[in-house]
Amino acid sequence: MAGLMSRLRAARGGDGPSGAQLHSEAGRAALFDTALSKLYKTIDQMQTKRVHLFNPIKTAEEQLQQIYLVLEAEEASIHDGMTGACLQYLLTSQRLHNIAKGLLGDQPLGARLVWLSFILQVLSHLKHPLLIHAEVLEALNSTIKVLRRDQRRLALAEANIYMQLLLRLTEYLERNPSCLPLFLEEKPQPAFPLLAALMPFVQHHTDEGKLARKAVVTCCQLANHSQQLEQFLLRHEIFAAEVAGALAGAYSNLPMSLPARSRKALKAWAYGAKAFSHRVPRAAHYFNALTFCGQVVRAVPSSVRGLILDQVYHGFMLSVLLPSLHHRAPEEAVAAMNYLRISLSRTRNTPLQGAFLRLLLASQFEGCWTLDRLVERLETLGEQSLTALSLFQALIRLHNEDVLLRLCLRFVHRPLARAAAAASRPPYPGTLMPADSGCNSEPESDIGTGTSTNTGAANHTGAGTDTSTSVHADKSNRVQLQGGTHPNGSSDVSAFALHNALEMRAGRKLLQLVPAQTAISPSERTFEGYLHAASQGVDAACAACATWRLSYLQLRPHQWLGKEDLDIDAATVNDNASAVSRCESEGLFLATLSRLTRRMLEHNLATNLLLSSIVSMLASLPVPALRNYLLDLNSPSIEGISFVEQLHALREDCLRLLAEDEGLEANLHAYRAGAEGYSRPKHRVKAPSTTAPASPARGPLATFHSSRRSRDRAASIVALPPHSAANEPGGVSTSAPTPASRASDADGASRRDARPEEPTIDDEAATTSNGGFDDGTSEQDSDSVCSSYSGSSSHRASAVSASHPSTRLTAAALATLDQERPPLPSPALGATTDTAPSVSAVGDEIKDSKRRALKVLIVQEFVKELAACAMEQSLLAVAM
């Protein structure tokens, strides 16, 4: 009560009433009547515009504050659920409505702010359910109607309190959904004034915009409890169009190309959304709009979600985002791919991610598929290639089946799966297995050579069996089957024979998996008839799979699959593998990835890090065919030099540089001695093992952290020495930071202190847009490279996933290599783009040698950790 008395005394500008007046009902009524009479008199003077010597705004504010304090004291003195006499008097005879009408006029300035502050204070602090009273609802509707009309002329303080009032109303409706029909209008046409008042402020990049976005999301959640509001959102598409328009407008305001200073500071593979927005201020507005759109899509009912996603896809992605991704200018392409990469991370595990994937997988621009255009940029030069690699790294990290199927799985799974099945089946002539024949009705006419050797059957005949005789018998049997005669002398190919063959092969398990409508009918008496029935079954299965796989894309299956007849002349695993080309191409992405791995010696270190990260993530998937394609030296799908062989080549190049320059190792020791601040003896000594730097820097390659024994075993497999820097010709300790890095950190800290205030991303974005993923950090830390689809394999993989210390070493070295300096004399290591920093502690006469020494150190660490990563992935996948 003492606090209430002091506030009342301050509001009156003098001594407050006595305690007896506030404790008694009669005293509160007298104070309330006096304040209300003075308020009416002040409003009358403002409306008639009489000449007066006092400030009417200040007087009205004092009287409203006194009324509120009396109402608060009255509520504290009565029981819960009861209405006091003063509040009951205020809610009758339209007294509250008349006060609102008098203070919502244009003149004098500040009257609206006084009324908004009073009504917000009453609704926020009084426990009585005021919204159930018609007087309060009428006053609120009048306030919303007037301020909607004059929203462009609102002062900043008025707009802020107005948004707080609307947010308070939405939160009250969320707690009491039964009051929602009171805010819905049916005549003259259906309307929801509360939502209509919020939408114009959604695109504001101020605190008012943040409050408006939060209130709109709350309104969308109310639609789950009100069928009337859900039908309103379905009938009025203007809401979905405004959500898509806000996103398109924010993206259109982004710079089409990153500034030169930002391009030098921004490494597309190392920064998240918050770090990006610090260097590109307008990016924060786009990320806020993207987060808001994702929150709305998740909050609305499922019936409204499809409408909003369709508007976003056509109104933003196809019309704005798609043309920017197909820009020919390198600077604009780099900016668009950076925006897309961070957008994918911001919308992870949300329905909006499906719309982005639909754009990448199923959209064309000027006759070119979007995904193919992005794959083509992998082989470009400079930042465009690095940004494209980082984008595909983010795509693969999503572990989306549609993306992986489009990129690689559909090109490697089918041929190698056929080969594995052919190697494990029994001899063909003894049983009838049309399902394993590869749908090849003419084995004697092979593609390219015109000859056929049944290697699959010959492998099971034994060492003393004549292969040519077995192949000839197999051909004759298949020819008899085409003519409708069984090799054992039967007159036809009956369903009984097929049943026996399948029963012998799968022990009735396969028959239990075959649907009834796809069972082979006894009327199919020829092999051609079986092929025709099997073709129809395959088409039906493909259509069903496409409907399931592309359901969130909202596409019809025939738009994706097309209508292709079954090719019965295709090559099979029984044909000559050396003379017949592969059944399917390896695909544009895998072909490009293969070419990039063959040229690892020509790339810079950053490109090799991103490339090796993509290869490691693909090799960690539980798909043996893909792992063999990427890592197995004896895989038939690999042409040319493999990825593992490139690791050996990089290793040999490092050793060659050390052997060519006799003083290189000594200069390396001198460089490290100058960096660590102590003198190293001139004679050769073994350096301590490589340790992680103290700072928790995040590297661009998320690799596996395994034990010393497992890493040594992995290194021995690829004929590399263990992970001890003492065993390296130039191995050194990396425990202390370099002077250049300390100077760079100090310079960066001073620049951060001097930087003006910039737009920030909404606080709720990190927790609501992607399930607790904070975009201020590198996206590498949120995902494990070895995560897979199955629960058991995911459990095994999670036990060994972490950021390796040498990865952080590589990241720190990359930061120093990015400084301006002359090129290195070693083109084999990509020296045209990566150079080393100058060290003031050492003389200018050995700078070139020190640069080469630092380059060798980084590549050595890269090769060792990458080899361990690749081989640990292979061993882990085999254990699965």
From Swiss-Prot:
Which residues fall in a compositionally biased region of kind Low complexity? Answer: 448-467, 687-697, 733-743, 783-805
Q: Where is this region: Disordered?
A: 437-471, 677-805
The portions of this protein that span the membrane are none
InterPro entries per the UniProt record, alphabetical: FHIP, FHIP_C, FHIP_KELAA_motif
User: What are the Basic and acidic residues biased-composition ranges?
Assistant: 744-758
Query: What family classification does the UniProt entry report for this protein?
Result: Belongs to the FHIP family.
Q: What is this protein called?
A: FHIP family protein 36947
